[in-house]
Amino acid sequence: MINPEYLSRIKHVFFFISLCLFALVLHGQKIYYTTENAHSHNDYEQKIPYWMAYDQGFGSIEADIFLRDSELIVAHDEKELEFNRSFRTLYLENIDSCLNKNGGNPYKNTTRNLQLLIDIKTDSIATLAKLIVLLEQFPVLIHNRHISIVITGNRPNPDSFSHYPDFIWFDGVLSRPYTPDQLSRIKMLSDDFKHYSQWLVDGQIPIEDIEKLKSRIAKAHQDGIRVRLWNAPDFNNAWAQLIKLRVDYINTDHIAALAQYLQTNHFEYISPGR
């Protein structure tokens, strides 16, 4: 008869070996750029706001908001305010419906995350205060590890980032230094591509500009923060070069084209962390 204590030890050994093998398999698996790395720039200008990007599985969607008569209106500039597009209706209610449909997840694929980038066009303090009151009406949305609410545009002083609720994150500026406390509330670092480089006629980024960009992006990744470059060229060759630079979110106005590009090309992706 086999000693029970011996059997127990054997089980523990096999369990440990299994864990090691599982870890090795995970370590050997490559992750690739997908539409979770795609950002729908000025999404409200799409033919069907929110849903066009969502249906392609985009990981980040952008809405610009104005505070007008105690309401949050989606618009690019004051001329568009006459369209009276409600931020609540276009984005919060649609995201909430997806969460309810998918058991608390934004997507049916439960590993997928969604970032809502909110570009504040009016006074940062007053608009953020109104936004927080509105967001608190959607508890499933704000208390969700798969959803990130990130503030860009007119932002409060970084020293006050920690004064805001935990469900509010901020978009930092890639070229700007931040303290560790400030970085702890920054979800993404963005910048204007043209601050770093001008696209050459042959469709390439100058080598000296590449090194400058790589250095900035590497520093952000060391801090565990993802990067987005806006105002960059928006076509296949440009996307490929942004990916080579390890930009995490590819900014686009062309949702279907970028989705197809990422689905038919396999570029290895290394996540910086949060």
Which residues does each predicted region cover?
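Bacterial Sec-dependent N-terminal signal peptides
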Residues: M1-Y33
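Phosphate-group recognition and catalysis centered on beta-loop-alpha active-site segments
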Residues: G28-R274
